[in-house]
A protein has these predicted regions:
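Membrane-embedded transmembrane helical bundles of large multi-pass transporters/channels
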Residues: 1-55, 66, 72-73, 249, ...
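Membrane-proximal extracytoplasmic
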Residues: 2-319
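Solvent-exposed, non-transmembrane loop/terminal regulatory segments of multi-pass membrane proteins
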Residues: 44-91, 97, 151-154, 217-231, ...
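Short flexible coil/turn linkers enriched for glycine and charged/polar residues
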Residues: 80, 236-238, 421, 541-543, ...
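Short proline/glycine- and acidic-rich turn/helix-capping motifs at secondary-structure junctions
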Residues: 120-129, 576-591, 757-763
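Short, low-order "capping/linker" segments at domain edges
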Residues: 128-145, 585-601, 765-775
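Extracytoplasmic
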Residues: 174-335, 629-777, 781
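Charged, amphipathic alpha-helical linkers/stalks
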Residues: 586-653
Length: 939
């Protein structure tokens, strides 16, 4: 290793820069002050500035990947966005139904935000061909049910409000014969429906908001499963769902938020408006139907929440990192002025970097959003090393200009090389095939070099000002760091042995380290969207994520669907109705015609819009209460089931009368308005349902063109391709399940795509890219160190602390069962780039002075302080609730610490041991010899 020279091109350049700074300080101060302000304004987030946030993971992957091209073709063919899901959970099925009915009604009023709101199998949604989607068996059952319910339904055709309806029921009870006949049987079958109507009327009085209909299908369902079969439910009705999706930003974005008139909105912005508004509607509906566990989830919500949480985490981490680094700097040097000056220069560099990011990349993503606390911990090192050497030279009696020149020329070379090596570790990421990692390399690598500029131009200007310069001309007492360092410098063989033992132990423990691909585990476990995603994963019999296959023809779609359904990893394939378009529908058409005949005579009058006459309704219900009592006496104990139904209806009537009559006159009037809303919902639902049944089209078979818009847009593409949605029967967030599912689907269709495929390839590419980036970083760093020292031995020596520190880190991960994941794998290239700088600075000073003592000199102190600031920078990420960012902070802080310890203990001991055998370099020049001015600080 050759001695460090002041005659190299780099040294002469740094010397010239120092002269310019000393002679023309204003040239370096005011232009940068103006540039700082410009950069801050330019790099403000939109809509105030030009910086965007892109949290779409699909955009992290380059378009040249085949699997991603398949996904882009899918998005181009099927422009509908991913579903946003409202999850309603409780053990009360009726409250769940009430909630989804109410919130769906609110969502359907805001069509500019919520598209294709789906929460039940509605005849209205399916249109005039709705019955042709049902099986022949179901059509026969419907025909039988409608025939049996005719006497009860006719009561509604002859009434317009609740009073007249219950008067009709009273008449039916009063005129019912003792012996059983068709009318009596129909009346008995209507008892559950009557109970449901009365119970729902009570509920409408006790809840705020507009009451929904009791649901016509459930009224006439004799099996008792009408509610569950008519809604989207899981876990036997414990969970109800409402699905919707945001408008497409390319066609509908500008109309989403009328307050923003700044041009076309991104899809992330549109999704944000939808999610925020939906959460407001959830809160409003919870006030109407309390006592439920309600949240929203889905891929857009998970991404949106991840962005919001990451922004909060990074903001907190950045502030904490900046404060900690400044405090460490201040404490380490027992002064405030210079650390504050270095911190100011750091802030200037960060502003430059933000502007650079905005200009070159244009946005931050889920990977690059962490760059600010990273650069805080790394770029402050430039100032630490420069200030430390500057102070040392002042204490050796040099003038301010001479001290600054010595620091800039000699320590500056190490700072420059360290900046290049760390930046090289980042820039090597641009050689990968993962767009998100390439952007990380550009931002962090370029940012480090940019932060180097104010540290080497603005900081020297500020260092030449201040009273601390006078104080530092005084002599200082010997530092205890020299005595501490002698503990291992005088025992190099013992240090070698301990290091080897720790490495062996670490290697043994490192075998326990595994890779965790699960992205859902990286998010904050307390986020509601994550909590409800887990609820669905635990309760659903199939995954919510699906694979996707595009098919050119209907025949091929039906054949491929049947083939895919045979795969053992597949739970279901949607849609189920492709086969209906190809089958013989003559029998179905005949049954639909018969159903229409059954109800052809039904004619419903418009519902009464006036407030309900509470007292008249009470008298009518009291009459029904009496008739039910008579019926109970007639039945006696002969039919327990019928007795139970009569008792339930009688009790419900008694409760309704109590509730609607309680309170003063204004309260009763409010009840009258509420019941009017309820009767309007009930009669409108009946009218719309039977009118739709009467107008079912039985003239022609079902065609693709007959699909309602919500289903047509989902399953038929813009060029006529057909979509198959393939649902796995396992949790495909788990890597093993994911791999089995994707592999199985590719045996059927090599172009299969969808979220599981995207996740599988995304995770694979991300992992491989970071591993490759680590190798690229290692190669680039080795070349730069070789160029700097012109010695292969120096390259090996500078990399030894990195190798040892990384091995210790792996051992600690195995000991504490910490897995590698898709966030903390970034540690691989970063630890190499950051850790090697310690070796460079130590070897730089060793080449200058030919003595292995480092900690007692300014270089050792600077390495220690810069290491602590880097640990603080990355360690601040531990405060994050996002578990991926948290784990990155843990590993980076630990990795930097282990590399620093190895650099400050093992490397000097090794240099001392090697120096005993043979001199490594020539005697330094006279200019670099230790000064003898009075009592000195050890160098």
């Amino acid at each position: 290793m050759k001695a460090l020279s002041a005659d190299s091109f780099l040294a002469r350049s740094l010397a010239g820069l120092t002269v310019a700074v000393c002679r023309h300080p204003r040239w370096f101060f005011w232009p940068q002050a103006v540039l700082f302000m410009v950069c801050v304004v330019y790099a403000l987030p939109r809509p105030y500035g030009h910086l965007d946030f892109d949290m779409n993971r699909d955009n992290l992957v380059g378009p040249d990947q085949r699997y991603h091209q398949n996904y882009l073709r899918l998005q181009k063919e099927f422009t509908q966005q991913d579903d946003v899901v409202v999850v309603v959970e409780s053990d009360n099925i009726e409250k769940n139904r009430q909630f989804v009915e109410r919130i769906a009604a609110k969502m359907q009023m805001e069509t500019n935000l919520f598209r294709d709101v789906f929460y039940q199998q509605s005849l209205v949604m399916m249109g005039s061909k709705a019955l042709l989607y049902a099986s022949e068996t179901n059509l026969v059952e419907m025909k039988t049910m409608l025939r049996a319910a005719q006497p009860f339904v006719r009561q509604f055709t002859q009434t317009t409000n609740l009073v007249s309806f219950f008067e009709q029921i009273n008449t039916a009870f009063r005129t019912a014969p003792r012996e059983a006949n068709a009318d009596t049987k129909s009346l008995i079958q209507a008892l559950p429906a009557l109970t449901r109507i009365v119970t729902q009327a009570i509920d409408s009085l006790q809840r705020p908001g507009t009451p929904p209909s009791p649901n016509v299908i459930a009224l006439f369902d004799t099996s008792g499963s009408g509610v569950l079969s008519n809604y989207i439910t899981f876990a036997n009705g414990r969970i109800f769902l409402v699905t919707t999706h945001a408008p497409n930003a390319e066609t509908n974005g500008p109309t989403v938020d009328q307050q923003h008139q700044r041009g076309r909105q991104t899809q992330d912005e549109v999704n944000g408006y939808v999610i925020d508004r939906l959460r407001q509607l959830v809160k409003q509906t919870q006030a109407e139907v309390p006592g439920l566990n309600v949240g929203i989830t889905g891929m857009p919500v998970l991404d949106y929440d991840e962005l919001a949480q990451s922004q909060k985490d990074i903001t907190l981490a950045s502030v904490v990192s900046l404060v900690l680094c400044a405090l460490i700097f201040i404490y380490g040097y027992n002064e405030i002025g210079r650390p504050v000056k270095a911190t100011i220069c750091l802030v200037v560099g960060l502003a430059y970097t933000l502007a650079f990011t905005t200009l070159t990349v244009g946005h931050l993503n889920i990977l690059t959003i962490t760059f600010v606390p990273m650069l805080i911990g790394l770029a402050i090192d430039f100032g630490v090393h420069l200030i430390t050497r500057y102070e040392e030279e002042l204490r050796h009696g040099k003038t301010e200009a001479a001290a600054l020149t010595k620091a800039m020329v000699f320590t500056g070379q190490g700072i420059f090389t360290g900046a290049l090596t760390t930046a090289g570790a980042f820039l090597a990421m641009t050689l990968t095939h993962f767009k998100g990692i390439q952007e990380m390399g550009i931002i962090c690598g370029g940012g480090l070099l940019i932060c180097f500029i104010p540290m080497m131009t603005l900081l020297p200007v500020m260092l030449l000002r201040g009273r601390q310069n006078v104080i530092d001309h005084r002599a200082t007492e010997d530092d205890t760091r020299a005595r501490i360092e002698n503990i291992w410098l005088q025992r190099p063989l013992l240090v070698m042995g301990i290091t080897a033992g720790l490495c062996l132990a670490a290697f043994w423990e490192s075998r326990k380290v595994h890779f965790d691909y699960n992205l859902i585990k990286m998010q904050s476990p307390s986020l509601p969207s994550v909590v409800f995603e887990h609820k669905l994963l635990d309760s659903a019999d199939k995954s919510l994520l699906y694979g996707a296959v595009m098919v050119d023809s209907l025949t091929n779609a039906v054949e491929l669907r049947e083939k895919i359904k045979q795969l053992p990893v597949v739970a279901d394939v949607d849609p189920p109705f492709y086969g209906d378009f190809l089958m013989d529908q003559s029998k179905k058409l005949e049954l639909v015609g018969q159903i229409k005949q059954e109800i052809a005579s039904f004619q419903f009058n418009p519902a009464d819009l006036r407030p309900v006459d509470i007292y008249e309704l009470s008298r009518t219900l009291y009459g029904l209460y009496g008739y039910l009592g008579n019926a109970l006496e007639e039945v006696g104990n002969s039919d327990p089931d019928l007795t139970g139904q009569l008792v339930s209806l009688r009790q419900a009537i008694e409760n309704l009368r109590k509730v609607m009559l309680q309170g003063d006159a204004p309260m009763v009037a409010e009840h009258a308005d509420k019941l009017a809303q309820f009767q309007q919902a009930l009669f409108a639902d009946l009218h719309d349902t039977f009118q739709l049944l009467q107008h079912q089209d039985d003239s022609t078979p079902l065609q693709v063109e007959d699909l309602p818009p919500a289903l047509h847009d989902r399953f038929v593409g813009v060029t006529g391709k057909f979509l198959l949605q393939i649902y796995p029967n396992t949790d495909v967030w788990q890597r093993d399940n994911q791999e089995k599912f994707v592999t199985a689907l590719r045996t059927v269709d090599g172009n299969v795509t969808g979220t599981p495929v995207q996740l599988y390839e995304y995770e694979t590419l991300l992992k491989d890219s970071y591993v490759n980036a680590a190798w690229y970083s290692l190669a680039a760093i080795a070349l730069m160190v070789l160029f700097h020292f012109r010695s292969l031995g120096a390259v090996i020596l500078s990399l030894l602390p990195v190798v040892i520190g990384t091995l210790w880190l792996a051992g600690l991960m195995g000991w504490f069962s910490i897995p590698i994941n898709l966030a903390n794998i970034m540690t691989l290239p970063l630890v190499i780039g950051i850790g090697v700088t310690n070796g460079i600075h130590i070897l730089n000073r060793f080449a200058e002075e030919r003595t292995p003592g480092i900690l007692s000199r300014s270089t050792g102190k600077a390495v220690l302080v810069s290491g602590l600031t880097a640990i603080a920078g990355f360690g601040s990420l531990i405060l994050a609730k996002h578990r991926g960012i948290y784990s990155l902070g843990c590993l980076m802080a630990t990795g930097i610490a282990t590399c620093m310890i190895a650099g400050l203990t093992f490397l000097p001991a090794l240099l001392n041991l090697l120096g005993r055998w043979r001199p490594l370099i020539k005697q330094p020049s006279a200019d670099n010899s230790p000064s003898t001015l009075g009592q000195e600080e050890p160098r």
